[in-house]
Regions:
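Structured, helix-rich domain cores that form ligand/interaction pockets
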Residues: 1-254, 286-294, 301-309
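Short, aromatic/basic-rich helix-turn unit that serves as a nucleic-acid recognition element
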Residues: 259-268
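Helix-turn-helix DNA-binding segment
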Residues: 270-277
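Residue-level detection of the helix-turn-helix DNA-binding "recognition helix"
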Residues: 278-285
Length: 309
């Protein structure tokens, strides 16, 4: 379930690995001298990961999922998290499992009936977060955590990422919980990289991810006659749908009284009066189904959570 992570290998508590060995695996690294605190940081890339080495620590930052799979559309499982951390250790020549985790993005995709943006209006208030729709995504922000819902296929295409065959023709709703800092506080434990694939910690992370989603207010859906119409509405269908919705809301009896008043005032003749009575009666008998759009996502998110337990 992890995507972007930030790891810190602190030399105060761990023996520094040979700098030359670590840097030999990095592409096009650069050196930055900071004279005010007498540090020199050398930074390069290991595949998609950014790796920085200075006289105090090694920092690893980037998508662990993309490092392991070559893309971050697939979900990183507990086992694949272990494999990715071990691969990093073998490559860089030190035990990456001993790194402190200072950031972890917890995420997965669910395949939905509609494009993801259809579901955003049904996700409402969340205490102590600022809700912010932005460029086809929905953000919830606070100082140490961030939630984002977005269209993962659209995001991958925009970044020129290769989309796995099984996802090419799907609508992928992405729910991502970003633990930006204070990770130890959020999980009530010191979190090392090796803990990310520990069963107890992995379950705890999944529980936090799920609880955060369930804490979001789910806005009630209005009864919507348009959901009874065809998937693609032409002008005639739309006109009929809106008329039917209005009749349901005003009430057939009230419409009868209004039509009768118009007839008595001579504004419509008797023929039109009876024709409209029949037309509105037929429309009033069209069944309305409740559009439980967000229930689909609720169910899918719950299924992901239950699969972790």
């Amino acid at each position: 379930m992890y995507d972007t992570i930030k790891l810190r290998y602190d030399f105060k508590y761990n023996n520094p690995p040979p700098k030359g060995v670590v840097l030999s695996y990095l592409d096009s690294y650069t050196t930055i001298d900071r004279h005010h605190n007498n540090t020199k940081t050398e930074t390069g890339k290991l595949d998609n990961l950014k790796v920085s080495y200075n006289n105090q620590s090694i920092i690893i930052n980037g998508s662990l999922c993309k490092y392991h799979y070559g893309e971050n559309i697939s979900t990183l499982t507990r086992q694949s998290t272990k494999e990715a951390i071990e691969k990093l250790s073998d490559t860089l020549g030190f035990d990456v499992g001993k790194c402190d985790v200072t950031r972890a993005d917890v995420s997965t995709n669910v395949s939905t009936t509609y494009p993801p943006l259809v579901y955003y209006p049904y996700l409402g208030h969340l205490d102590r977060y600022e809700r912010n729709p932005f460029k086809g995504s929905l953000y919830y922000k606070q100082s140490t955590k961030e939630i984002i819902f977005y269209d993962k296929v659209k995001d991958a295409k925009a970044k020129g990422m290769e989309i796995p065959t099984e996802f090419k023709h799907t609508k992928l709703f992405r729910y991502e919980l970003r633990l930006l800092k204070s990770l130890n506080k959020h999980l009530n434990q010191i979190v090392k990289a090796k803990d990310l694939y520990d069963e107890t910690t992995y379950t705890k992370v999944g529980s936090l991810w799920y609880k955060t989603y369930t804490d979001i207010e789910k806005r009630p859906n209005k009864e919507n006659i348009i959901t009874n119409m065809s998937d693609t509405l032409n002008a005639k269908d739309l006109d009929k749908a809106l008329k039917t919705q209005a009749i349901k809301e005003i009430g057939l009896e009230e419409l009868h009284q209004q039509l009768l008043a118009l007839k008595h005032r001579g504004l419509i003749n008797e023929s039109m009066y009876y024709r409209k009575i029949r037309e509105y009666k037929v429309l009033s008998e069209v069944g309305i189904q409740r559009d439980d759009t967000i229930d689909e996502v609720n169910k899918l998110i719950k299924e992901v959570y239950e699969s972790l337990m």
